[in-house]
């Protein structure tokens, strides 16, 4: 599931990325101080972010999976217009009507001293 999210980010298409989120999904994004719940606010976040050329590299991931839930946390790097931003993430994916959707996504810039 995380790989699908990365692939959609690389398309630079906000609607493709936002479509991965549950209708009641929550996004605490790396580049925003706003809590975004629901499709419209999540779409708005990615419309703003993807105005730039964005790439994502997974550094580490730790996944727990059941038949209907995946929790995935770790580190990734955003490359935004050639500048690297080191960040940490937590995703919760839920299976809804046979499709996996992002229920919760928290991402924040990695502190400089860790």
Model-derived regions, located:
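Amphipathic alpha-helical repeat scaffolds
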Residues: 2-7
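Short, well-ordered alpha-helical segments enriched in acidic and aromatic residues
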Residues: 11-24
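A short gly/proline-enriched turn/hairpin at secondary-structure junctions
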Residues: 26-35, 47-52
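A mature extracytoplasmic/lumenal domain signature
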Residues: 31, 62, 75-76, 91, ...
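Short, mixed charged/polar active-site loops
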Residues: 34-35, 84-86
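Surface-exposed, charged secondary-structure patches
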Residues: 43-81
